[in-house]
A protein has these predicted regions:
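Flavin-dependent oxidoreductase catalytic cores
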Residues: 1-147, 151, 155-167, 175, ...
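Redox-cofactor binding/interface segments in oxidoreductases and associated redox assembly factors
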Residues: 13, 76, 230-233, 281-282
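Short, contiguous acidic/charged loop-to-helix segments that flank catalytic cores in large enzymes
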Residues: 25-31, 134-142, 182-194, 266-271
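Hydrophobic alpha-helical scaffolding
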Residues: 28-32, 55, 147, 185-193, ...
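Rossmann-like dinucleotide/flavin-binding elements
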Residues: 138-169, 212-226, 237-242, 261-294
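N-terminal Rossmann-like dinucleotide/flavin-binding domain of flavoprotein oxidoreductases
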Residues: 179-227
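Short, conserved catalytic or adaptor-binding loops enriched in Gly and charged residues
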Residues: 200-205, 244-252
Length: 294
């Protein structure tokens, strides 16, 4: 950097190359604002204003970095894809309305960079169009019944309510959030909880969205709500391989054969030190690799 010192007004301090892409496009296990120490070092060395970037999703984290003097500017990329109104929400005291990036890197890095396709976002389905859809309301009464209170069901229910539909969401469990909330119990996946938490907060502000928890979506109940539209958002279940006897053992009490969902449910029962223990993982996809890493 010393060769450019006299020509530079501001340093944008980042890191990572293709060989260390988990640092170039921050993996979700890296803490918020983790790169700020780099900006601080460059600032102290060259005495020039510095910008820091990297998983800065929380306004408090950004404020602390600036207050400590680690950096003079905060740079955000994925956070503004997830919520283009991030800065405005902070300025006007609406931090609780921020739709935080969960650092999944699927729609932005995977889809846009990896596949050279239009950008997408797991938590912001309107990333390419904005939220103009809210301006066009339904022109006649419309009842919408959404079955399932995971993130897909919450998104469908909120969207329907925001355009003026009377909306009913039915969830058989005591809590909303679905698989995203469950998976966030894995330590390196805890950031996923931000999305269902945001959706639950968004739903709570809609007076025409009625939520039934601990409720089964029976035909009688659905019919009684007089639906014009029914949305099936009941989620997915793990696919089991064709192994003889597997269905008799998997997820049963007293056995050590579990789907990933049951493994997460039992997460506090496993010893912290697994040295000497043998674990067989059937399936080498993303879920299998996550289990192996855990």
């Amino acid at each position: 950097l010393q060769y450019f010192e006299k020509e530079v007004d501001v340093f944008d301090v980042s890191c990572g190359l293709n060989g260390s892409i988990q640092y170039q496009i921050d993996a979700n296990y890296l803490p918020d604002g983790w790169r700020s120490y780099m900006a601080k070092a460059v600032k102290e060395k060259y005495g020039k204003p510095c910008m820091t970037v990297g998983n800065i999703r929380d306004p408090k984290v950004a404020e602390d970095i600036l207050a400590r003097g680690d950096a003079d500017f905060i740079g955000m990329g994925r956070g503004l894809i997830a919520d283009p109104e991030w800065v405005n929400k902070v300025e006007f005291g609406n931090e609780c309305d921020i739709r935080k990036c969960i650092s999944c890197n699927i729609g932005c890095a995977g889809h846009r960079i990896g596949l050279n396709q239009p950008i997408r976002c797991t938590v912001n389905p309107a990333v390419n169009t904005g939220e103009d859809y809210m301006k066009q309301k339904v022109n006649k009464p419309c009842n919408v019944v959404v079955i399932g209170g995971g993130t897909a069901g919450l998104e469908a229910a909120c969207t329907a309510a925001e355009v003026g539909c009377t909306t009913f969401l039915i969830e058989k469990k005591a809590e909303l959030g679905g698989l995203a909330s469950v998976i966030s119990k894995i330590p390196d996946k805890k950031r996923l909880a931000d999305f269902p938490n945001y959706m639950i907060h968004r739903a709570s502000k809609l007076h025409n969205l009625f939520i039934f928890k601990n409720t089964s979506a029976t035909a009688e109940l659905v019919k009684s709500l007089n639906p014009d539209i029914i949305v099936n958002a009941t989620g997915s279940v793990p696919t089991l391989p064709p192994i003889t006897g597997l269905h008799d053992l998997v997820d049963k009490d007293g056995t050590n054969v579990a789907t990933v969902l049951k493994m997460i449910e039992r997460i506090n029962e496993y010893p912290e030190d697994m040295t000497g223990k043998k674990v067989s993982i059937i399936g080498g996809g993303a879920v299998g690799l996550d289990v192996m890493e855990f």
